[in-house]
Structures are given as structure tokens and as C-alpha cells.
A protein has these predicted regions:
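Key DNA-contacting residues within the recognition helix of helix-turn-helix
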Residues: 16, 30, 41-42, 51
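Residue-level detection of the helix-turn-helix DNA-binding "recognition helix"
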Residues: 20, 34, 45-47
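Short alpha-helical DNA-recognition segment
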Residues: 23-41
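Short, basic/aromatic recognition patches
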Residues: 67-84
Length: 185
């Protein structure tokens, strides 16, 4: 798989939520992106797509970061869990935290994978589910329902995925960015 999803969801709703949480006016957001205020409005309304450069700027702005004590507590809960689970940025799929059981499946040390996107290891079933998230309102709401699906398997030795039932739960972090808890059931 490539480093990023084949189907990149519009970032307008997330940008609007980020602006509201951080009390950023459209005019200031326009300055950050180097565009007109009306462009920000069209992005947020879903009327205009971002260019690749604008999207990269938005992804840097909206990417999940473990900034607060609560965010770090969530990462510690995942890292201390007996279950097979990991936490990724919902937007970039960068690995934020991982349980020992999940880390034991990897052929590289966890320290080498933390902060890197796991998308390249996605199975076709994971790609299909990622694409279907838009129709479920996954990116439009702060706390959509969890989704469960069969993952299929990949042939990776670095991050092997064996066919199993998986649950994705989207969580909003303290800065308004979204993380995804990935659990093997």
C-alpha cells in the first residue's frame, strides 16, 4: 500500500471543528493557508477541494498529537493493555501508541515504528473500510460509532496483519485532532 489512503476524505469538516475549538476565524485560517477567506468557507462547506499543497498544510495542522496529560494517559493505557491494540492518528495513520501484544507481532522495534504511518501495511479489506468511513459520517462528527470488520491478511513481515475481526474507535484528543484506537477482537 502507499503511504497515504487512496481515497483521501475532504478535510473541510475537520478544519471547521479545529477552528471552532481553537477560536480561529476564517480570515486567520486563510492567512495560514495563503488563500482567500472565501476559499476556507468553500472547503468547510465541501464545495471545493484542497490542492495537494493545501492538503499537506491541513494534514500538518490537523494531525493527532499527544499534547495533554489526558492524551498521554490514553497512550499509557494502550501501551499497558494486555490486548492486541494500537493507537494511530485518524488522518495520517501515524502510530502513536501500541500494546506489548501488538508490538510483539512487529519485526522492527516499536521505537522505529512510532510516529510513522502504518497505512502502507493496509490490507485490501482495510482500504475498503477506510473508503467506506465517509458514508458512515466518520469524519463529520467528533465521536462516530465504532466500526467492526474482518481485516483480511497482508504479507508484510514488518507489520503483519492476520485475518481477524477488528474494531476501530475514533477519539477526539485534547487539541481537537482525532486518534483511532485499533483493537483485534
Amino acid at each position: 500500500m502507499s503511504a497515504s489512503p487512496l481515497h483521501a476524505p475532504p478535510l473541510g469538516p475537520q478544519l471547521k471543528r479545529w477552528r471552532a475549538l481553537h477560536r480561529v476565524k476564517q480570515s486567520h485560517a486563510a492567512e495560514l493557508f495563503g488563500v482567500a477567506q472565501s476559499t476556507i468557507s468553500r472547503w468547510e462547506a465541501g464545495l471545493q477541494q484542497m490542492s495537494p499543497g493545501e492538503r499537506a498544510t491541513a494534514e500538518r495542522l490537523l494531525a493527532a498529537r499527544l499534547d495533554s496529560a489526558g492524551d498521554h494517559a490514553l497512550a499509557r493505557l494502550v501501551a499497558g493493555s494486555a490486548g492486541r491494540m494500537h493507537l494511530v492518528c485518524d488522518l495520517t495513520h501515524r502510530l502513536l501508541a501500541c500494546s506489548p501484544a501488538r508490538a510483539a507481532e512487529f519485526s522492527q522495534p516499536l521505537s522505529m515504528l512510532l510516529g510513522t504511518s502504518l497505512w502502507r501495511y493496509a490490507t485490501p479489506a482495510i482500504v475498503r473500510m477506510e473508503t467506506a468511513l465517509d458514508t458512515l459520517g466518520w469524519h463529520d462528527r467528533a465521536g462516530p460509532p465504532s466500526v467492526e470488520f474482518d481485516t483480511g491478511a497482508n504479507a508484510s513481515r514488518v507489520v503483519p496483519i492476520r485475518g481477524s475481526l477488528c474494531r476501530w474507535t475514533r477519539m477526539t484528543l485534547s487539541d481537537g485532532s482525532a486518534a483511532r484506537l485499533v483493537e483485534t477482537l
